[in-house]
Amino acid sequence: MTAAAVSTTRTLLSGKPLRALAALILIVNGLLPALWILLTSFKTEAELTQKPITWLPHAPTLQNYFQAFSDQPLLTFLFNSFMVALLSTILTLFISVLAAYALARLNLRFRDLIMSLIIAVSTFPLVTLLVPLFETMRALGLLNTWTALILPYTVLSLPVCTLVLTSFFESIPRDLENAAMVDGCTRFGALFRIVVPLAAPGVFTAGILAFVNSWDEFLLALSFNSNPALRTLPVGIQLYQGEFAFPWPVISAALVVGIVPVAILIVIFQERVVSGLTAGGLKG
């Protein structure tokens, strides 16, 4: 093989075609399951089990969606999930903004150690925290309440949100908030009037991450709540299956209904989320 051929091969392997292929694989891997769930929600039980398996429904029906709302209190599940996720996100953002600002601006003696601990805590498997969290919630008398989910969800989302916001705050020039403080603004005032508005993409990114994390969580919602009126969507969806029956079209319809709010949220704020994920890594 000539030197020119070797150079061309290296360019192809390390250039745009390889990156495009990797991106395509990731997109297909993420979209195919969602597409299958969407199409299944319009199929009948008989059509789903027929051979050979077909992707597109022969006679699309909305009956599964009507049944999803009639078989279980799906609206109640959606409301509970939305309120828990919203309140958890607000609390997470407030705490993570303060923590990230301290890490980004204050000359903390053990800053590197704190950052390392934040990263380490974020890697803990949720199942290892289940018993301690359950005992804590029981001791506080918070079981079967929204608070029993809001507090753990906040704690679980804080590490990632703090890291995202710390990186973003570090990219904002100090001169802007210093000028505000010279004009009589307090440090808290400079944070919420200057830094947070400039860091809006990062704040939106952290908020989306916290909201989705709370919206999708199943284990804690199942373990900390036995009140049917307070069940969240992930726990409610598993109630559609019977002891010997798995109505996959109805379950798929309920899943689609649960995906729609998050999908709308991401579509609306996608530009801010993308800029928040990328701009935080730029200094100056």
Regions found by a protein language model. Name each.
Residues 1-13:
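Short, Lys/Arg-rich, polar N-terminal cytosolic tail immediately upstream
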Residues 15-284:
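A structural signal for multi-pass alpha-helical bundles of membrane permease subunits
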